[in-house]
Amino acid sequence: MEKKLTHEDYHDVARMMYFKYGNSMILGGHLNSQEVNHVIQVGASVLMTKDGFQQGGSFVQAVVNNDLLGAVNRADSTMRKCLLFMTYLMAHVSVSYELEEAKNFQFENIEG
């Protein structure tokens, strides 16, 4: 029987994906810690919306619906830098597949 996913599971996977791949997909380089937290929260929302776990806001809906114009028009300044990462999450990440790695991912070497 497959484990029922939780909000925490989605956040764990979004966080791991950001620290594995996010920096290479962010326009304009480095984000501050508040922006990183925002990216992880919105990334988790993209994954939850994609899976039907919960419905995200208008930016997230546009990303999930592959609506580039809508996503750009609804993106805040941080999300404009992160559109590539958000579309990567939408197209290539399965929470149930990535969850075990996310639970065991070593963040201390990355976060400094």
Kindly label every feature range from the protein language model.
Residues M1, M16-M17, M25, M48, ...:
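Detector for methionine-enriched segments
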Residues M1-M25, L99-G112:
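Short, functional C-terminal segments
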Residues H7, F59-V63, S77-L84:
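Generic hydrophobic segment detector
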Residues D9-K20, H38-V42, D67, A71, ...:
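Charge-rich, solvent-exposed alpha-helical interaction surfaces
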Residues K20-R74:
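Amphipathic alpha-helical interaction modules
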Residues V72-G112:
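Amphipathic alpha-helical binding modules
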